[in-house]
Amino acid sequence: MPFTVNTSDEFGSWFSPLEEALQDDILFVVRLLQEHGPQLRRPYADTLEGTSLSNLKELRVQHRGEPYRILFAFDPKREALLLIGGNKGGDKRWYKRMIPSAEAIFERHLETLEKGEGNGKTP
């Protein structure tokens, strides 16, 4: 049974203007996440350090030699939420900048779930 993968508004805003070839590469890895769920490992997914969320992970996408990362987490419903993405190539502070944003997006998502409202969108 495939896992549900939803997207945050922030992820959608980042993803929508990307060129089609990059979107295709990202969607390939998202489909692997749908198939394997939390068991997806390197080279396509990895755990993160420096986060207060034990289940915050990254999808790893290589596109034309550039390293793209999508931060995601599984919520209590065991559905993945793609939080935020970007090209980390040459940016040593990428994780320091993006992890706090991803944590805030996920916390907001959890609050929404507690209220009984769903805000995830399936790619």
What are the language-model segments listed below?
Residues 1-67, 76-80, 87-123:
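Basic, Lys/Arg-enriched alpha-helical interface segments
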